[in-house]
Amino acid sequence: MRIVIAGAGEVGYHLAMSLAPNHDVIIIEKDVSRFERVSELDVVAINGNAANMKVLRDAGVERADVFLAVTGNDEVNLLSGLAAKKVGAKNVIVRVENPEYVDRPIVKEHPLGYDVLICPQLSLAQEAARLIGIPGAIEVVTFSGGKVEMIELQVMEGSKADGKAIADLYLPQNVVIASIYRNGHIEIPRGDTVLRAGDRVAIVSKTEDVEMLKGIFGPPVTRRVTIFGAGTIGSYTAKILAKGMTSVKLIESSMERCEALSGELEGVRIVCGDATDIEFLIEEEIGKSDAVLAATESDEKNLLISLLSKNLGARIAIAKVEKREYVKLFEAVGVDVALNPRSVTYNEVSKLLRTMRIETLAEIEGTAVVEVVVRNTRLVGKALKDLPLPKDAIIGAIVRGNECLIPRGDTTIEYEDRLLVFAKWDEIEKIEEIFR
């Protein structure tokens, strides 16, 4: 497929890197240093303004199967998206940072002609709400048009899974543990693998079966949630959670902002105060929270809030992190989940591309996850156990038409099956060769 990307920032660069091996990728970037960086990839790079019609025509946007507008400027993204659609691009996906342009994380079939508008701020809020809603969840990735979810969960101390072999967990029939991240290393588990507190497990499940996982790896429900920062992310997360949580508290330092939201967020207790004041946190009983979300405008403040909350007894701490390079640092010092808006955008765009039959990679704790389509007739009718897969590779799910199957060794492959394969990064080329 022909894919034109406007913007070679973090999102655009990583999309180009993942798509280039299997597609014709053209990327437009105005900044010289970013242009030079992306030029090193196997792509056609054009130095120019994506809102300029001549630049768009030089990129051949009229022949594009997909046009992705992910520059750091909302107006450039919106204008280039309109122009791309007008001259013939089949699918146009536009990122907008300002939530005034959209009222939900993803808007499809926009009246102005965009196929998809994505708001990173609202998408991050939605992701935070999903993680809080599944106790122990660290990351959730959707595949195959929403039929399959890959969830990374942390095994909590004293949970049903702590100290048990996988075979003894009696997981629901359509659920499989595909990988375990333990002590900095990835393991592909077997039935006799014993889980331990602190393990991070990647689980593949039918979307409708996710609810059945609650209570196995952590507590069954999240009852008390505290959110720090009443900006777009904090207030939208509170709005989502208030529909199903027993107690949602939103803490904000600005009295003006608190007053503005007081009549808007039904079921949310809004408190004005300094989130870095330890006495205030004790008074508000933050230590009794099942989950806290630090969503202020400062990375440093979010880190401090998270660590203070955990120290007081909060079970899970999630923090918004603007600087992508801080994500690993936050998690290394005790933050359970660090969410970066640009990473969330990348994941959302990748998810949309998968629904357009563009196969892309995902990653959970260093394990590569690739979705492959079976079109090699030599493989049709073969049982999974007879495939020459690398020793540590595992097929986590099969999507067949509108049906999702959690496979066993004797499951046979059919033409056009979509397989979700977990493997180590250095084995991806071999896997692609098998299904080519």
From Swiss-Prot:
Entry's Gene Ontology cellular component terms? plasma membrane
Specify one Pfam family.
Answer: TrkA_C
Q: Give the RCK C-terminal domain ranges.
A: 138-219, 356-436
Gene3D superfamilies in the record: NAD(P)-binding Rossmann-like Domain, Regulator of K+ conductance, C-terminal domain
Q: Check the record and name the SUPFAM superfamilies matching this protein.
A: NAD(P)-binding Rossmann-fold domains, TrkA C-terminal domain-like
Residues of the RCK N-terminal domain: 1-118, 222-339
InterPro entries, from UniProt? K_uptake_TrkA (IPR006036), NAD(P)-bd_dom_sf (IPR036291), RCK_C (IPR006037), RCK_C_sf (IPR036721), RCK_N (IPR003148), Trk_Ktr_HKT_K-transport (IPR050721)
> Can you name one GO molecular function term for this protein?
potassium ion transmembrane transporter activity
Q: Which UniProt keywords apply?
A: Ion transport, NAD, Potassium, Potassium transport, Repeat, Transport
The residues that hold NAD(+) 1 are 7-11, 29, 71-72, 95
Q: Indicate whether Zinc-finger appears among the record's keywords.
A: no
Residue positions annotated to bind NAD(+) 2 are 226-253
For this protein, the record's NCBIfam families field holds: PRK09496.1-2, PRK09496.2-1, PRK09496.2-3, PRK09496.3-2, PRK09496.3-4
Protein's job: Part of a potassium transport system.
Domains as described in the record: The RCK N-terminal domain binds NAD and possibly other effectors. This is expected to cause a conformation change that regulates potassium transport.
**What is the recorded name of this protein?**
Trk system potassium uptake protein TrkA homolog
